[in-house]
Amino acid sequence: MFVEHLELVDFRSYVRADVPMAAGATTFIGSNGQGKTNLVEAVEYLSTLSSHRVSNDTPLVRLGADQAVVRGRVRAGTDDARSLLLEVEINARRANRARINRAPLTRPRDILGVLRTVVFSPNDLAVVRGDPSDRRAFLDGLVVTRWPRMAAVKSDYERVLKQRNALLKSLSGKGRSAGAEIGATMDIWDNELATIGAELLSARLDTLSAVMPLTSAAYREIAPVNDLTTASYKSTIDLEGLWSPPQERESSTPIDRKELANRFLDTLAKRRADELIRGVTLVGPQRDDIILHIGEMPAKGYASHGESWSLALALRLGSFQLLRDDGIEPVLVLDDVFAELDATRRDRLASSVVQADQVLVTAAVASDVPEILRGERFDVGGGQVLAYEGNNDD
């Protein structure tokens, strides 16, 4: 799968841009602030309806415009000429819209799963060093990329959680005296939260089990050490007997989702008094964390900058390989990656991804990108994307 043409209208800094692409490597070269990342961000948005740079869509619409349009022609594969035209209209004042082959979709999220991407950028350092929310976002993003229907599950969970929190807040401070007011209403929300939450948690655990052995292999390939990278899942729900941390890639027994939902419900019941006092839900995936290790030590707080960077990159490369193992050929985006790597790690990274259907690279300096990934190159600057003329070789 690869993007063979990208068109932007009023997206970020671009009034308009038309960019032909090809399978293999494409590199966008330009100084910082010239718009090269905007191009790969647009490809990411077509794939995920989100950006790795911002939490809402407002900055994606060019200042002074009412809407932005991202349009991409996606080809099925290097040996498959079938293609689809994907289009997303990002509106500043009303709901976004999406189309496939000019036909409008009922909901924008129906476009998810047509184009798959794996994006690595300097922001990914937060997955290793940042807050639990950064690691949850990474894992949930991979879950939705694997199974696009999980976007609706996640949305449903967030809706129920919001409504349950509103109920708890209205009863906050009443403690045990609120029991008569809660009655069946709280039980209904608990059941719905546990059922949907168990589905989301099960998908997270399955994905973590699958991606970590691949991440460990990628880390050893990139870093000049042979440390094993592992992960454990810190849950508010007792997972003993249901799931154990992944060590090696081997077939695992599917998680008993019914038992997981029952444990979720039991934990909610035990924490209800505390929740009534605090006015917020204290149990569920929104409270969980993924603990990453390099060797015997937790990466957060102990790993060096170089180790953290290598682990963050390995997580994305593991994600890329997992999707390929699932039968999906994603577009790989390496946004300002090579400037942070020494020559040895650059070459190792390039060698590990060169066989991808499509690799989109951004760089301030052309010489940072290994020769085997040069491929098609563009100069980016002044709101234009032009054929490369060698102005940023040093």
UniProtKB/Swiss-Prot annotation:
GO terms for cellular component: cytoplasm. GO terms for biological process: DNA replication; DNA synthesis involved in DNA repair; double-strand break repair; SOS response. Keywords: ATP-binding, Cytoplasm, DNA damage, DNA repair, DNA replication, DNA-binding, Nucleotide-binding, SOS response. It comes from the Bacteria. The keyword DNA repair applies. Its main location: cytoplasm. ATP binds at residues 30-37. InterPro entries: DNA-binding_RecF, DNA-binding_RecF_CS, P-loop_NTPase, RecF/RecN/SMC_N, RecF_2. The RecF protein is involved in DNA metabolism; it is required for DNA replication and normal SOS inducibility. RecF binds preferentially to single-stranded, linear DNA. It also seems to bind ATP. This is DNA replication and repair protein RecF. The gene is recF.
